Every structure is written in C-alpha cells, then in structure tokens.
Amino acid sequence: MLPDWKSSLILMAYIIIFLTGLPANLLALRAFVGRIRQPQPAPVHILLLSLTLADLLLLLLLPFKIIEAASNFRWYLPKVVCALTSFGFYSSIYCSTWLLAGISIERYLGVAFPVQYKLSRRPLYGVIAALVAWVMSFGHCTIVIIVQYLNTTEQVRSGNEITCYENFTDNQLDVVLPVRLELCLVLFFIPMAVTIFCYWRFVWIMLSQPLVGAQRRRRAVGLAVVTLLNFLVCFGPYNVSHLVGYHQRKSPWWRSIAVVFSSLNASLDPLLFYFSSSVVRRAFGRGLQVLRNQGSSLLGRRGKDTAEGTNEDRGVGQGEGMPSSDFTTE
C-alpha cells in the first residue's frame, strides 16, 4: 500500500488525465471517422483512428483505476472486474506503442520515397498494420491475465485487503516476470527503436528540403518530439519497472506511479493527432470555437466572436494541404 498522500496524488492525476483526454480523443475520433469514410483513406489515418480507439479504451477503463486509487489501492470490486480492467488497460498501452511505430514508418516512407509511396499505398495496409498491433497487444496481455487469475487457487492478499494486479504468489512470479520482460522487449524497446530511426530520418529530410515551408517543418519536429515524449515519459517508466522487477523478483514500489505515466499518453496523443492531420486541426479549431461562442454568449458578445471564428476556421480549411498526408512531398 502507498501512503495516503501518494494515493491522493495518483487519484488527482487519473482524474486530470480522464477530463483532458476524453473530450480531445472524442473530437479526434469524430474527425478520423469522417476521413475514413471518404474514398481511399490514407493508411496513416487508419493507424491514427486505431490509436484514438486505444486511448478511448484506456480512458473508459480509467474510472476503475480512479476507484482503486481512491481506496488506497485496495480492490473492493468483483475479481472479474479486476481481470477485465487490467486486460483492457494494459492491452491499450502496448497497442499504442506499435501503432506509434507504424505511424512513424508511414511518415518516413511518405517523405523518403514520395512517388513510390503515393503509387503503392492502400487502405488495406493500414488495416493490416492496426490489426497486427491489436493482436500482439491483446495476445501478450492475455497471457499475463490468465497466469494471474487461472494458474493458482490461492487468493493473493496484501495484509487483510485484496489488491488488483499488485501481488503474486511465487508460482505466478515464475511466469509473470519473464512474460513482463518479453513485453518490455517486444512491445516497447523494438517499436521505440523503429520509431526513433524513422522520425530521425523523417525530420532530417523535412529540414533539408528547401521547398518545405516553415510551418510544415515545425509540425514535423512537433510530431517527432511528442512521439518521443510518449515513449520516454509515458511508456518508459512502466517498462523499466519490468526490468527492475525481473532483477529483484518482485514489483518495485513505484510501479503504480509508473502506471500513471503510462496513462498520460491518452492526454498526450491528441497533440500528436494535431501535428499529424489537418482534419484534426480543423476539428479542434471548431471545438475551441464552440467554447468561445459559449463563453461570449454569457458575456453578450456572441455575434461578433462567432463571425470572426467562422472566418478563421474557413481560412484554416483553405490553407491546409492534401488531407491524405500532410507531410508527403509532392
């Protein structure tokens, strides 16, 4: 168990992530669904839609983590709820890593081999890549859940209180720790290495092209930085806890804090969507305009602000490039 003040901080962090991540991802979901319905959607939009769905899965399960943190990490809900929550929560995290890697590959190919990319890209490729990411994450996390809940008849407790996915028997640790190590290698380090290479080449090409405008260069750098932060800040601590746990043969005390950082990716991904797609930038712009209109209506200035905001939104829509791929060189 963590001290009460640490549990309170984790509780507040979960609430902030939920309140910021849910509306932003819902806006992105609406934008990507609209783009996918158009003829011949780009593979990157299918991957971005899948990443949005992974974030929403995590956010929809986050209330159970909030209840757990509010109870000082004692689990009072049914055991099956713990199993399903853990399965979906951690599957969404590891699905995101390979989806981010897939997006980085698509971006790199789009600028490194623009002609071949435009001629060969198919929506089916995005669907296959997304399915592979989901199957890999669900398959790996299913192993961990089965080990925890079906490989023992002993109910694991912390003192007199039941915990969720925190304490294991020695027999469970013999299987869980190697599986966690494999998760760390296959679903974190490999996709991170792929992503770093692709975005290093992507940014280098974008910055070295004289015909690429300053705005597109800034978006390229922003996309790479946000993705790198996702891996290092959000996913890094949690996967390092797997390495430490394998060495110490127990979960480190700070693992629950690392899980919070993993959840943070659901609030950070909307920034990635913003840098990646013009349809999301327009959707976010319209969402902000609605908030401005509501605020101005309370102040009696709705008419003027609405007219100005509409003109600005039209300007953004006209100034963007091809919606299929913002970074593909012509």
Curated annotation (Swiss-Prot):
Signal peptide: none annotated. It is found in: Cell membrane. Changing Q148A: No effect on SCFA-induced G protein-coupled receptor activity. Glycans are attached at N151, N167. GO terms for biological process: cell surface pattern recognition receptor signaling pathway; cellular response to fatty acid; fat cell differentiation; G protein-coupled receptor signaling pathway; glucose homeostasis; leukocyte chemotaxis involved in inflammatory response; ligand-gated ion channel signaling pathway; lipid storage. Changing Y90A: Partial loss of propionate-induced G protein-coupled receptor activity. Residues 299-330 are annotated as: Disordered. It is a multi-pass membrane protein. Pfam families: 7tm_1. Residues 1-12, 63-84, 148-173, 241-255 are extracellular. Gene3D superfamilies: Rhodopsin 7-helix transmembrane proteins. CDD domains: 7tmA_FFAR2_FFAR3. SUPFAM superfamilies: Family A G protein-coupled receptor-like. Interacts with FCN1 (via Fibrinogen C-terminal domain). Belongs to the G-protein coupled receptor 1 family. G protein-coupled receptor that is activated by a major product of dietary fiber digestion, the short chain fatty acids (SCFAs), and that plays a role in the regulation of whole-body energy homeostasis and in intestinal immunity. In omnivorous mammals, the short chain fatty acids acetate, propionate and butyrate are produced primarily by the gut microbiome that metabolizes dietary fibers. SCFAs serve as a source of energy but also act as signaling molecules. This is Free fatty acid receptor 2. It comes from Homo sapiens (Human).
